[in-house]
Amino acid sequence: KVNGVILRRRVYFMGRWLKHGGKYPELLLRIFRVGHGMSEMKLMDEHLIVTDGNVVTFKNDFSDNNNKSLEWWINKHNWYSNKEVLDQQMKSDAANGEESVEETSTSMQAKVKRFVKNHGYYSLPKFFRAHLYFIYRYYFRLGFLDGTEGKIYTFLQAYWYRYLVDAKIYECEKLGVKMKSQGDLKA
């Protein structure tokens, strides 16, 4: 019995479909039968999971075509950066025997991305890792083929956002504080 459907996400930025830079295809579980699925209890990068039954992957895409302004996008990612810092602090606490963070997902792509992020990316030195991630996404994953929009998106999402997260982690460590909350999205 099929209880879930995975779709291919097609991201648009400034009106352009981002076909490169590691953005396509992003496989996401987006449809599940009532009573057989749920959302992970995570602050960032949460996924829908199917609790029982089979999951199929459709050939069709769904469009993530947000036509809001760049200012809105930047505000949203500033807000996301607070959530990312909170999430990393919770993972650090879990490694020290405190609250655990669930590591399940129905998508193998999501499992691999999460593993690389938690055991690869976050094991690299702060700030340096943002440089490497941008180079990987823009040059090795061919983000430059998406034109000016691809360059802007990859710089902001793979470099600026990741550098901002590291700056906030650094600030918390320097002051000896924890991120209290993600705050309100001011868009």
Annotate each language-model stretch with its function.
Residues 1-172, 183:
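Catalytic-site signature of metal-activated, phosphate-bearing donor transferases
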Residues 175-187:
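Alpha-helical transmembrane segments and their immediate juxtamembrane flanks
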